[in-house]
Swiss-Prot record:
Source species of the chain: Strongylocentrotus purpuratus (Purple sea urchin)
Gene Ontology molecular function, alphabetical: ATP binding; ATP hydrolysis activity; microtubule binding; plus-end-directed microtubule motor activity
Main location as per UniProt: cytoplasm
Region described as Disordered: 673-692, 906-1031
Domain of life where this protein originates: Eukaryota
InterPro entries: Kinesin-like_fam, Kinesin_motor_CS, Kinesin_motor_dom, Kinesin_motor_dom_sf, P-loop_NTPase
Name of the protein described by the UniProt record: Kinesin heavy chain
Length: 1031
């Protein structure tokens, strides 16, 4: 480690241009004094650099971030992060527009600059670059390169430096690979739309670049980390209009930014002993960047609008506080064995000097305690010559000969060599233990995930069975209810038919009675005219009779006042007739009102019919969508079957290719053994060949049996999964059929209910008509009773008058006329009495019918309520079955996706056990072409990590490109079985070059050279497997 040095955090301020809405609604509140000073609201703020709105992306990068690239490549840690309110330009500053040279942000430019610096450095340097990309969303660390890792934790290494455990790390050897990683992470990042920003970042993103370099000549190793942080902006809910999930995100963003502000304030204060790094995961990760071992640059982004003046002021205050923080930076350097040796020698010499000085001081102290005064010259703290003299005798007392000295030097060199070997062994063992720990953790995580998947499957199966049983019970209940409704419907239809017949008969009778009433009314009018004529005659006759009686009374001396009551009775009859006329006019008005009510009811009935038609159209559209979804499901199932057939075909072809590879290996082994036997022993040639053939046949049989078992197990598993998928499809089809049946029953019930409602409306209208007719008949009864009473009184008066007149009259002509008038009046009165009797009978019949209908009306209303409730229940059950069918479809799709993901993860796990290639980059070379090999040194091999087998290449002249045959084979086998088979094969079989099925002359020459080298050095085993190479 180099000596530590202090440096302040560099703070630059960037002010973005105003957008269209701000230009229309506000004004500019910022004033640029110089390149280091800006004024907002009358307050002056100073920073390392001020970027105006017209500053380009390149200028921002050159002034703010370019120097950090050189620092990171020199072994320092670096951090660049953007801070500011929402929609202030942070993401544009950090990322910009990818692929656009003019609008690229700091991250893509810094990536390109790192590689440009590497290509211009000394050729003896070798670089390894790793990148990782994660975000802090809702106070959880989420890996943007592996979305399944949603809650990563922060740990500390042996030097107490925080790091994110479990984050995906990708090796990169070119800027294009790093940009691909950035694009992949950006596609997984959380964004949302607010009132202030259409692409508002809802999380803090951290892009980490780790650079390790090694000088191949001096073995000097340096490492540096570069954190590129895009913070989410602070938000005011009143301005952004956040609701729901966006509001929760804003709360977490403001909370983490508040924790960052608290850390900055505590560091700027300088008096606080506790720095609250652990209040937020973001501050925990950036602990080294804030007051630790890193060169940090903060880009504070502001808005020039007066609408955001308060937020801009708080952002500038944050920058002012951060500018006062000091970091202690050191070079991250791994010392070599020679450097550690030199340090050890220096410390040893220093220790010896301190021990000698300690002895001098102890002697001086003993003399002082004994009461002796020590002269100034002999005091230890002022006489360095005494220290030298005490150290010299130790060196002079030892007499060493040259031979012994040479021996000791040789032993010393050997010990140092052994120390170096032990150090390398310790490093290898530590790496191996770390790899094994990582593999154990991965296996445990895989096992726990498989257990969770199994438990989820068990719970889902139990829930599906329970839902299936509940659906069956519901279907039974629905069928029973439908049967009951059908029976009730038959009964009601019969009752309705009977009522319709009765209503028709009643309506016919009412029509007849109405016609009779019309005839009676016309006859009454005629009678009234006749009665008026008779009244006139009667009044004239009465007047003449009264005159005669008066004359007779005067002659006899009597009084004629007794005849006046007859005249009063005649006047009462006139009043009754006027009352009847008024009642007839009242009935006309009521008939008009009834006709208006009928029209209103007909209009409402037409509206209800239109509503029913619209609902039927909606049902037809829902059926069409259901049929379309079923067709899609059929097409998807057919695609799955086709892919499975293709998969089986590829597996068969893979088996054939593996058998051919084994045969070729066997043939090559036989050829090699033949050549060796010709050189050594020509006599035992046939015997060794037969033994080799027997061993190879046994190996081929064992390989074939193991492979067949593996394939059989995999095929059985695939068949079981297919069987489960078919069962789920059958269940889905049954549910769809039940859904269709319920839909049809629901439509039938709806039609029946519409018909019943129409009939009920007709019955209610008829009932209203009957009520009105009853009221009308009541009035008629009263008027007819009054008329009958008046007619009865008139009849008595006429009879009495006629008797008196017959007794008193003397002339025959008058008697004949009066008798004729009385007979005509009697006939009319008898006709009216007959009509009244018929009307009373009709009235009584109507009253009886009304009473019967009133008794039946509550029953019909109860039945109607029951049917309406049942229809509602059926609608709810239909809705629930629809939702259940949708849930089943979603569950089925999720199950299919889960099975696919499990297969993909299994294949990925098998591939993950293979080698992870750490791509080394040699400095001083131009960037490699996309199609060539990247970062290859020392004979054309890439640096290999993990447990994968290396690729053995023939000499470069005339050799074809290597083709990997083992990827697909490893997919069909378990990793352990594949490794065992490979080890067994490597014990006896040589490695074939991956150049194809045919051996070239260069391949044969290379194999002969390897066999000779193997024979010459029997003590050393060849590096054939990855495990041997790793050890």
């Amino acid at each position: 480690m180099a000596d530590p040095a202090e440096c302040n955090i560099k703070v630059v301020c960037r002010v973005r241009p105003m957008n269209a809405t701000e230009q229309n609604t506000s004004h500019i509140c910022t004033k640029f004094i110089s390149e280091e000073q800006v004024q907002i609201g009358g307050k002056l703020n100073m920073f390392d650099r001020i970027f105006k709105p017209n500053t380009t992306q390149e200028e921002v990068y050159n002034k703010a971030a370019r120097q950090i690239v050189k620092d990171v490549l020199d072994g320092y840690n670096g951090t660049i992060f953007a801070y500011g309110q929402t929609s202030s330009g942070k993401t544009f500053t950090m990322e910009g527009v990818m692929g656009n040279p003019q609008y690229m942000g700091i991250i893509p430019r810094i990536v390109q600059d790192i590689f440009n610096h590497i290509y211009q450095m000394d050729e003896s340097l070798e670089f390894h670059i790793k990148v990782s990309y994660f975000e802090i969303y809702m106070d959880r660390i989420r890996d943007l390169l592996d979305v399944s890792k949603t809650n990563l934790s922060v740990h500390e290494d042996k030097n107490r430096v925080p790091f994110v455990k479990g984050a995906t790390e990708r090796f990169a050897s070119s800027p294009e690979e790093v940009m691909d990683v950035i694009e992949e992470g950006k596609s997984n990042r959380h964004i949302a739309v607010t009132n202030m920003n259409e692409h508002s970042s809802r999380s803090h993103s951290i892009f980490l670049i780790q650079v390790k370099q090694e000088n191949m000549e001096t073995k000097k190793k340096l490492s540096g980390k570069l954190y590129l942080v895009d913070l989410a902006g602070s938000e005011k809910v009143s301005k952004t209009g956040a609701e729901g999930t966006v509001l929760d995100e804003a709360k977490n963003i403001n909370k983490s930014l508040s924790a960052l502000g608290n850390v900055i304030s505590a560091l700027a204060d300088g008096k606080k002993s506790h720095i609250p790094y652990r209040d937020s995961k973001m501050t925990r990760i950036l602990q080294e960047s804030l007051g630790g071992n890193a060169r940090t640059t903060i880009v504070i982004c502001c808005s020039p609008s007066s609408f955001n003046e308060s937020e801009s002021k708080s952002t500038l205050m944050f920058g002012q506080r951060a500018k006062t923080i000091k970091n202690t930076v050191t070079v991250n350097m791994e010392l070599t064995a020679e450097e550690w040796r030199n340090r050890y020698e220096k410390e040893k010499e220093k220790n010896g000097r301190l021990k000698a000085q300690l002895l001098i001081l102890e002697n001086e102290l003993q003399r002082w305690r004994a009461g002796e005064s020590v002269p100034v010259k002999e005091q230890g703290n002022k006489n360095d010559e005494i220290l030298k003299e005490m150290m010299k005798p130790k060196q002079m007392t030892v007499h060493v000969s040259e031979e012994e000295k040479n021996k000791w030097e040789e032993e010393k060199v050997k010990l140092y060599e052994q120390l170096d070997e032990k150090d390398s062994e310790i490093d290898n063992q530590s790496r191996l233990t770390e790899k094994l720990k990582q593999q154990m953790l991965e296996q445990e995580e895989l096992l726990s995930s498989m257990q969770r998947d199994y438990e989820l499957l068990q719970s889902q199966m139990g829930r599906l069975e329970a839902e299936n049983a509940a659906a069956k019970e519901e279907a039974k209940e629905v069928l029973q209810a439908l049967e009951e409704m059908a029976v009730n419907y038959d009964e009601k239809s019969k009752e309705v038919e009977d009522k319709n017949r009765m209503n028709e008969t009643l309506s016919e009778e009412v029509n007849e009675k109405m016609t009779a009433l019309h005839t009676t009314s016309t006859e009454l009018q005629k009678l009234q005219e006749l009665e008026q004529h008779q009244r006139r005659r009667i009044t004239e006759m009465m007047a003449s009779l009264l005159k005669d009686l008066g004359e007779i009374g005067t002659a006899l001396g009597g009084n004629a006042a007794d005849m006046k009551p007859n005249v009063e009775n005649i006047e009462k009859v006139d009043e009754e007739f006027t009352m009847a006329r008024l009642f007839v006019s009242k009935m006309k008005t009521e008939v008009k009102t009834m006709s208006q009510r009928c029209k209103i009811l007909e209009a409402s009935n037409a509206e209800n019919e239109t509503k029913i038609r619209t609902s039927e159209d909606e049902l037809d559209s829902c059926r069409m969508t259901i049929q379309q979804h079923e067709a899609k499901m059929k097409s998807l199932s057919e695609n799955i079957r086709e892919t499975e057939g293709k998969k089986r075909h590829l597996e068969d072809s893979l088996d054939m290719l593996n058998e051919e590879i084994v045969k070729l290996r066997a043939a090559e082994e036989i050829r090699l053994t033949d050549q060796e036997d010709k050189k050594r022993e020509e006599e035992d040639k046939m015997q060794s060949a037969t033994e080799m053939q027997a061993s190879m046949s046994e190996q081929m049989e064992s390989h074939r049996d193991a492979h067949q078992k593996q394939l059989a197990n995999l095929r059985t598993e695939i068949n079981e999964k297919e069987h489960q998928m078919e069962e789920l499809k059958d269940v889905n089809q049954r549910m769809t059929l039940q859904h269709e049946k319920l839909q049809l029953d629901y439509e039938k019930l709806k039609i029946e209910e519409a018909e019943k409602a129409a009939k009920l409306r007709e019955l209610s209208q008829q009932f209203d008509r009957r009520e009105q007719a009853k009221q009308d008949l009541k009035g008629l009864e009263e008027t007819v009773a009054k008329e009958l009473q008046t007619l009865h009184n008139l009849r008595k008066l006429f009879v009495s008058d006629l008797q008196n007149r017959v007794k008193k009259a003397l002339e025959g002509g008058d008697r004949d006329d009066d008798s004729g008038g009385s007979q005509a009046q009697k006939q009319k009165i008898s006709f009216l009495e007959n009509n009244l009797e018929q009307l009373t009978k009709v009235h009584k019949q109507l009253v009886r019918d009304n009473a019967d209908l009133r008794c039946e009306l509550p029953k019909l209303e109860r039945r109607l309520r029951a049917t309406s409730e049942r229809v509602k229940a059926l609608e709810m059950s239909l809705k629930e079955t629809k939702e259940g069918a949708m849930r089943d479809r979603k569950r089925y799709q999720q199950e299919v996706d889960r099975i696919r993901e499990a297969v993909r993860q299994r294949n990925f796990a098998k591939r993950g056990s293979s080698a992870q290639i750490a791509k080394a980059i040699r400095a001083g070379h131009p960037p490699p072409s996309p199609g060539g090999s990247t970062g290859i040194r020392g004979g054309g091999y890439s640096g290999i990590r993990g447990g994968g087998s290396p690729v053995i290449r023939p000499p470069s002249h005339g050799s074809p490109e290597p083709i990997s045959h083992n990827n697909s084979f490893e997919k069909s086998l378990n990793p352990n079985d594949a490794e065992n088979m490979e080890k067994k094969a490597n014990k006896r079989l040589p490695k074939l070059p991956p150049g194809g099925n045919k051996l070239t002359e260069s391949d044969i020459a290379a194999m002969k050279a390897r066999s000779k080298a193997r024979n010459n050095t029997p003590g050393k085993a060849p590096l054939t497997t990855s495990g041997e190479q790793g050890s």
